């Protein structure tokens, strides 16, 4: 269903729902609107709404739904329309606006006529008018683009420019003088602010004119106008650059002079200030070194060049005595293009590299002419400039941060030390907008063409779109400490924010510096959006900078975007701004991931022995949660205990409690750390060595350790043995008791078996203590080292210990399981007996009821009640017996699987021992025991227990490489002997070597041997044992001489002949 005004409907619904519903009316109103918006027929929608709203409104549902749909048709939820009365004030201001624009046009015409009265000597009147026509066309196109952009961002800009106190939205006032129809359309929004703007602008203009008229160099009599600004030009040692917002196109930036020319024609008093005269230097020489601070007119489209070329173009005077010399010209500056035009490397047309046409600047800077520099002009000494006077100068009439030079509204960042220069970071080319007749005229006059403007911007990873002031100071000026401390954030005067008292927050003394050159101070930053209005001062040392060098930027920003700054003397921040280009978020503080704690155990130490019992500890620690386990005398310490809670939160409550444990402030509560939680801060070499060493579990008494063991070799463990690194076999056995010792730091020689005496000591120690501990040992297997390190003599004792302890563990596990099974059987027996007794009792009561028919009703009711209870108990017992029988079956299966796993592990160990050439006697015994156990459990078929496929010359299944004694558990009737003929008795030994060394079994010394399968006669019962012994001897003898490869080939040969 279509809704005309959703907000009005929501507010109407909220008022309607408030008295009839307990839920939040606004939320429910949103829900109702969402229901009504569904695309359904009216009847279905009504039923659907009633169904959905029944939960909230209950009885009121039907009435509310009817009222809702009625209002949707009648639209009575819409507020009554009030007749809009035209306000007289906007009309008056609109008239005033028209007057201003009409007034401005004659003013511009008058200024043009005045310019025509004073033509320059080298220019004709026709050329001047031609140039003005071209400039006017360009300006019109320029402002069309500018206004088109600002139409989209008007609301965003108006919201912040007013608060930030920039230039009261320069684009709006500029739009008033440029587009009459557009201004009339939007005049209602801006009219209340117009009088303030006009008053401030006229005040600003008058102050500026006063300053300009009063300017006279100190060291010379008042010269003519041309001498005045030409001589002042040569004494300019530093530059200040203001960058236009990043979104402006190539032809949008304006100089201060242009800004004030455009907007000074009308003011609140309705009078026009006298027009400015043309700048003679600019007309004759093609540039003016005063730039936008010149009190004479440079026209609507002045020449723009970069200040970085000043040192090479104008020979500056030497610094006053006592000051360091300026850096050599051109340092850290890109090479400037020559006078001839040429294609630049960037995407835009124009000569040479430089900032792109999308971001241009206004910087009138002179070309070099080779004339000698004039005398140094020093201003009258003044007190140091404070930051408040620099920033708030516009709001204080009659004051100027830079006397006789800067317009009062120029908000300058504080100057920086000499050795901090700028780099040019834009890479797009830009071309001068002066071409055609004016350019050819300049070439004829011998004046150099305009240079390119280089735009200084912060790296893109610094602040995203936050582009602002970039100040370059190249004057040799000393630092004067500043005593100004900024107060809280003032949007009219944002202060420098830094992590400490940075050395850059120091200002210059007017008595010790030359007059600063404020060439090209434009208003391009004044009405950018607030993200583009942050002032950034980027400084770099005057040496070639690498990416990792310390680079400092001072940021003037609102409080919400402040960042700490590292000084040159301090370390870089965690994420330096010059780190990864293109990542705008990298200077933001990172967020720590929340650790998910799982520890539930607490260690309690220094408990008095009389208090270290379960009752006392439970009395205190049960206040904080459910205790799962309490161990007193933990790790054999009579003053320690271990408390385990159900959850980590409960343990945290206990450890963070301020209450004294057992009213004793000396008792300490700590988190219990398991062995695997210890930080593994080991290098890869240490980890490799740790994989090689033996983890052997010794007895609980520390005094039983031999004296030759270093104390560091003993480490107390509390956790059960866990899996060891990569190559060490997983340990299986009973959990380790607290207080057991582990030989964890055995020297390398002991581990690798180089020193047999030390190894024998260790093995002796293991033999002494390992048997009683019942713990298992890891198998020596390290694939990272050659097998030659291990000798069977050095490893015999530990291997014996391992095999013995493992079989002992298996027996203990089986014993425990048998005991558990026995207990289950006893319980089942008792339940069965109880069931039988209850059934007998039930039968007795039933017979009693049948016999005594004349029984009282009360007794009858009691007997019936008892019978009912007995029936319930009987059924319950039967269910329990059924479940116990089903549970007992899986336990048997589990036992089988464990036994099978143990059997497979033992076979794997045997393979490894055989491949490394170790003694396998103990392991074979253990394997035979496990096979018997497996046969008893039904894992292996009785009489088919040949699982040692690795020994001897196994056929078919998993043939191994080992050579050892055979344990025949399977009767194999395949023939294993070959009767041979065609040789003499003396050649028997050679024949055996021939069989073992070559595969040519049928030929021997160029003779063909007679070989056939040996078919033994069926022996009688009495001689069966003897024949088996003979067979074993034959096989063992042949195994001694046969190698692995021949064994495989022979098997293949045999299998082929067997198929025949």
From Swiss-Prot:
The protein depicted here goes by the name RNA-binding protein 27
UniProt lists compositionally biased (Pro residues) regions at 319-356, 371-384
Which regions are flagged for Polar residues bias? 387-402, 755-770
The modified positions for Phosphoserine read: 928, 1012, 1020
Write down the species.
Mus musculus (Mouse)
What top-level branch of life does the organism fall under?
Eukaryota
How are the domains described in the entry?
Answer: The RRM domain mediates integration into cytospeckles.
The lineage, from the top, is: Eukaryota, Metazoa, Chordata, Craniata, Vertebrata
- Which residues carry the post-translational modification Omega-N-methylarginine, per the record? 455
Which residue windows does the record flag with biased composition (Low complexity)?
225-235, 255-268
Q: Where is the composition biased (Acidic residues)?
A: 1024-1037, 1044-1053
User: Which residue ranges traverse the bilayer?
Assistant: none
Q: Name one GO molecular function term.
A: zinc ion binding
Coarse class of the protein's main subcellular location:
cytoplasm
Q: Which Gene3D superfamilies match?
A: 3.30.70.330, PWI domain
């Amino acid at each position: 269903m279509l809704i005309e005004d959703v907000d009005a409907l929501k507010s109407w619904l909220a008022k309607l729902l408030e008295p009839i519903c307990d839920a939040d009316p606004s939320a429910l109103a949103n829900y109702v609107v969402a229901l009504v918006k569904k695309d359904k027929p009216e009847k279905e929608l009504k039923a659907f709404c009633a169904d959905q709203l029944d939960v909230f409104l209950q009885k009121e549902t039907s009435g509310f739904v009817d009222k809702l749909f009625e209002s949707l048709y009648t639209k009575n939820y819409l507020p009554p329309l009030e007749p809009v009365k035209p306000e007289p004030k906007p009309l008056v201001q609109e008239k005033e606006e028209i007057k201003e624009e009409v007034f401005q046009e004659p003013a511009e015409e008058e200024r043009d006529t005045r310019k025509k009265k004073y033509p320059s000597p080298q220019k004709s009147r026709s050329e001047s008018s031609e140039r003005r026509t071209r400039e006017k066309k360009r300006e019109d196109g320029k402002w069309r683009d500018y206004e088109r952009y600002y139409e989209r961002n008007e609301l965003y800009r108006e919201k912040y420019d007013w608060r930030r106190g920039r230039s009261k939205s320069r684009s709006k006032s500029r739009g008033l003088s440029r587009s009459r129809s557009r201004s009339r359309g939007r005049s209602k929004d801006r009219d209340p602010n117009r009088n303030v703007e006009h008053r401030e602008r006229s005040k600003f203009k008058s102050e500026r004119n006063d300053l300009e008229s009063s300017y006279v160099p100190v060291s010379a009599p008042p010269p003519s106008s041309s001498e005045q600004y030409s001589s002042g030009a040569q004494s300019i040692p530093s530059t200040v650059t203001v960058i236009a917002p990043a979104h402006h196109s190539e032809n949008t930036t304006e100089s201060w002079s242009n800004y004030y020319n455009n907007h000074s024609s009308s003011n609140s008093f309705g009078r026009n200030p006298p027009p400015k005269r043309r700048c003679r230097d600019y007309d004759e020489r093609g540039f003016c070194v005063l730039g936008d601070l010149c009190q004479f007119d440079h026209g609507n489209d002045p020449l723009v060049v970069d200040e970085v070329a000043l040192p090479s173009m104008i020979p500056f005077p030497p610094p006053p005595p006592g000051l360091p010399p300026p850096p050599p010209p051109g340092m850290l500056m890109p090479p400037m293009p020559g006078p001839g035009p040429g294609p630049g490397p960037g995407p835009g047309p124009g000569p040479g590299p430089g900032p792109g046409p999308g971001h241009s600047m206004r910087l009138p800077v002179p070309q070099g002419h080779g004339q000698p520099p004039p005398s140094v002009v020093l201003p009258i000494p003044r007190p140091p400039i404070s930051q408040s006077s620099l920033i708030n100068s516009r709001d204080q009439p009659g004051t100027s941060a830079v006397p006789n030079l800067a317009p009062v509204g120029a908000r300058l960042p504080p100057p920086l030390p000499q050795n901090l220069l700028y780099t040019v970071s834009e890479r797009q080319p830009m071309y001068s907008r002066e071409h055609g007749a004016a350019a050819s005229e300049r070439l004829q006059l011998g004046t150099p063409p305009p240079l390119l403007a280089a735009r200084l911007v912060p790296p893109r990873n610094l602040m995203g779109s936050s582009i602002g002031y970039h100040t370059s100071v190249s004057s040799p000026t000393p630092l004067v400490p500043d005593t100004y401390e900024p107060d809280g954030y003032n949007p009219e005067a944002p202060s420098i924010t830094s992590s400490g008292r940075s050395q850059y927050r120091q200002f210059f003394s007017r008595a010790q510096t030359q007059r600063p050159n404020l060439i090209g101070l434009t208003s391009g930053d004044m009405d950018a959006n607030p993200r583009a209005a942050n002032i950034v001062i980027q400084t770099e040392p005057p040496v070639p900078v690498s990416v990792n060098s310390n680079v400092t930027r001072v940021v003037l920003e609102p409080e919400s975007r402040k960042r700490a700054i590292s000084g040159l003397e301090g370390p870089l921040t965690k994420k330096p701004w010059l780190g990864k280009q293109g990542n705008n978020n990298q200077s933001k503080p990172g967020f720590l991931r929340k650790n998910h704690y799982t520890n539930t155990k607490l260690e309690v130490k220094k408990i008095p022995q009389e208090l270290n019992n379960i009752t006392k500890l439970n009395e205190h620690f049960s206040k904080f949660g459910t205790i799962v386990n309490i161990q007193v005398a933990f790790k054999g310490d009579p003053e320690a205990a271990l408390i385990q809670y159900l959850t980590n939160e409960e343990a945290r409550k206990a450890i963070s409690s301020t209450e004294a444990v057992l009213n004793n402030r000396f008792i300490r509560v700590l988190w219990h750390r398991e062995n695997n939680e210890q930080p593994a801060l080991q290098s890869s070499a240490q980890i490799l060595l740790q994989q090689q060493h033996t983890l052997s579990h010794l007895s609980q008494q520390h005094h039983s350790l031999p004296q030759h063991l270093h104390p560091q070799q003993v480490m107390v463990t509390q956790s059960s043995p866990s899996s060891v690194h990569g190559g060490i076999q997983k340990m299986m056995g009973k959990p380790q008791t607290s207080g057991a010792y582990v030989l964890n730091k055995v020297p390398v020689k002991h581990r690798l078996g180089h020193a047999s005496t030390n190894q024998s000591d260790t093995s002796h120690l293991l033999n002494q203590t390992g048997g009683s501990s019942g713990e298992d040992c890891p198998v020596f297997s390290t694939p990272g080292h050659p097998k030659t390190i291990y000798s069977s003599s050095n490893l015999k004792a530990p291997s014996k210990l391992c095999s013995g302890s493992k079989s002992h563990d298996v027996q203990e596990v089986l014993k425990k399981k048998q005991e558990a099974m026995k207990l289950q059987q006893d319980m089942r027996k008792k339940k069965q007996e109880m069931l039988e007794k209850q059934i007998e009792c039930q039968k007795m009561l039933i017979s009693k009821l049948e016999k005594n028919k004349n029984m009282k009703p009360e007794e009858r009711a009691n007997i019936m009640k008892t019978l009912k209870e007995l029936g319930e108990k009987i059924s319950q017992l039967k269910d329990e017996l059924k479940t116990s029988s089903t549970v007992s079956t899986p336990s048997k299966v589990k036992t089988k699987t464990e036994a099978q796993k143990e059997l497979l592990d033992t076979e794997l160990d045997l393979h490894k021992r055989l491949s490394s050439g170790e003694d396998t006697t103990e392991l074979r015994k253990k394997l035979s025991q496990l096979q018997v156990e497996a046969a008893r459990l039904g894992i292996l078929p009785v009489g088919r227990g040949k699982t040692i496929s690795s020994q001897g010359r196994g056929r078919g299944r998993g043939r191994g490489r080992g050579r050892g004694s055979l344990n025949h558990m399977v009767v194999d009737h395949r023939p294993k002997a070959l009767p041979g003929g065609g040789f003499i008795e003396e050649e028997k030994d050679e024949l055996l070597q021939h069989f073992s060394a070559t595969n040519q079994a049928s030929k021997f010394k160029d003779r063909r041997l007679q070989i056939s399968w040996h078919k033994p006669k069926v022996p009688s019962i009495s001689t069966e044992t003897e024949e088996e012994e003979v067979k074993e001897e034959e096989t063992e003898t042949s195994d001694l001489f046969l190698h692995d490869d021949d064994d495989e080939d022979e098997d293949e040969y045999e299998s082929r002949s067997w198929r025949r």
